Regions:
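Short amphipathic alpha-helix that is part of the acyltransferase structural core
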Residues: 1-17, 33-34, 126-129, 133-135
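Short loop/turn motifs at secondary-structure junctions and domain boundaries
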Residues: 20-26
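Conserved catalytic-core motifs of GNAT/GCN5-like acyltransferases
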Residues: 92, 101, 106-129
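A generic "binding-loop/recognition-motif" signal
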Residues: 95-96
Length: 135
């Protein structure tokens, strides 16, 4: 996971995560692999009190982009969220808003975020918030 996300952290697309954080949160991650090589991943951080969850660190390897791995990760994250009883998932992004809009997400104000997440929101980063209702 670290090797996959590191280039995107370096260019500012993703927020930096260290090995300790990823290891601590490994159960939150969904991966797509081919022959043992990880080509896509995303983490789901639930906010059960708000019946929503944050999909974070959605990353697809450049070699795999356009081949449906991002869609597969999204579907798996949605399935996990539904199994947890969540009614929506949200993402914070600075660059890939069109990808999310094409997949049923809608932009909302950062004030929409659950209080626990709002307290950690980095206003300097100016991330846009997108939400998708799960059916």
């Amino acid at each position: 996971i670290l090797q996959l996300i590191e280039p995107f952290e370096r260019d500012g697309t993703l927020v930096k995560r260290d090995r300790t954080e990823i290891e601590r949160d490994i159960a939150n991650y969904t991966i797509i692999d081919h022959d043992g090589v990880i080509f896509a991943c995303a983490a789901l951080y639930p906010y059960p009190e708000a019946k929503t969850g944050e999909m974070a660190a959605l990353t697809v390897s450049p070699q795999s982009q356009g081949q449906g791995d991002g869609e597969k990760v999204l579907r798996r994250v949605e399935q996990r969220a539904r199994a947890m009883g969540l009614e929506s998932i949200f993402v914070l992004t600075t660059r890939t808003m069109h990808w999310f809009l094409k997949r049923g997400f809608v932009q909302v104000d950062p004030d929409w975020l659950p209080d626990a997440r709002k307290r950690k929101y980095n206003w300097d980063r100016r991330s846009m918030v997108f939400v998708k209702k799960l059916s």
